[in-house]
Structure formats: structure tokens, C-alpha cells
């Protein structure tokens, strides 16, 4: 049976939540968020998180017509979901492809990229930055950008300056503080953040963010300290060596 199309009225709680958040945030931008077609489809097919997405890939290769129909449906639904957030006041929109890193470049280009591109095309006329992110997607960065992204999110496994170079030095990046360090010693996290900032200075633009989601055990005060640290660091030069960023209190 055909999957039902999304009823626009179902998005009313989303648009209300975004509008209220934007009002409360004032000048602080809000990034809209949606799961990309491959990642959403993998949950539909597997029914749970998967290490290798073998069942998903089997459907992709053994029944390509079914696969394309499924991803086209997800793309329409996701595009409407993302567009609603943009119209409600989000400042940028992010397409989050958590599990795309399990794909080869060939499979991504043939079976996934067209559907991610369809999502990003649905919000192109809104005139706001479109961010595309995936984990373990170093080998897919260029292909993911070519789906229609203005900014590329980079995971914690890929050094930010390497990602910038792979993207030809012309694409702003987002990332990539390692979430695994948020529960560790502050000194280690502090040094890591400074290194991320140094590497990000090689890009044409850098949205400082995590390299994946916030772990549920994270102390919110740590996130506050991260924001304060990032705002305290002066503009960086691309040739600053690791460990050379000054501490805000003047300590070495």
C-alpha cells in the first residue's frame, strides 16, 4: 500500500514551537533540523539502529524501484517538515544524515544523493543557509555538498582543516567538537575546542558546533562554558600552530 502523504496540519505544533523559540531567543539564531532520506529510511527498514545497515542496503540493491519510491516519499515529507521550520522563523536549515557514512561513494551518488537534493531543493527559495551533515562521511563530503548544501557539517572523526581542503577551501563548515569529551576534564575539552577553532580558521566560514549530538549525560553548564570560550577567543589566523590560542584569563 502507498504511504500516506503528510497532512500540512500535522506540522502546526512544529511551526508553533519554532516560532515561540525564535521569539524567546531574540537575536540568537535557531537552526531548523530534519533527518535526511537515507537515515530516516534506514530506521523504517531496519526498525532500530544498525551497525552496517545490511537490510537497508539489500532493499536498495535488490528492489531499486521500491527503494526509490520510499526515499522519494521520505524526501517529500522531510522537505515539508524542514520548510515549515524555515517559514516559522528558523535562521538556517540542517539536513542530518547520521548513517550515510556506511555508504560507498557510488551507492550514495546512485541511490541517495538525488533524494537528499530533492529535500534541499524544497527550501532553496527561502534564502537561508542549508547545512548538510553526516557522521563518518569524510569520503562523501563533496558529494553531500553537491546535493545542494551551502554549509557542510563535519563529524568529530574528520579534522576540520582536512574537510576544508577536501571541499576545495570554498565551503563554510560546521563542527566539530567531539561530544565524547563533554563529560571529561575541562582542560582536555578546552584544548580540543581551541584546536577545532584553529582548524576552522582555514575555512571561508565556521559555525562552531559539536561533531554529532549532545550526549544525554552532558552537564548543561559545560555547554555554557563552551559558548563562553568560543566567544572569548579572538579572530584566528589560519597559520596558528596547535596549542597557540590564548586562554581568556591570560594563563598560558
What are the functions of these language-model segments?
Residues 10-252:
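Active-site loop segments of alpha/beta catalytic cores
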Residues 1-10:
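Alpha/beta catalytic barrel-like cores
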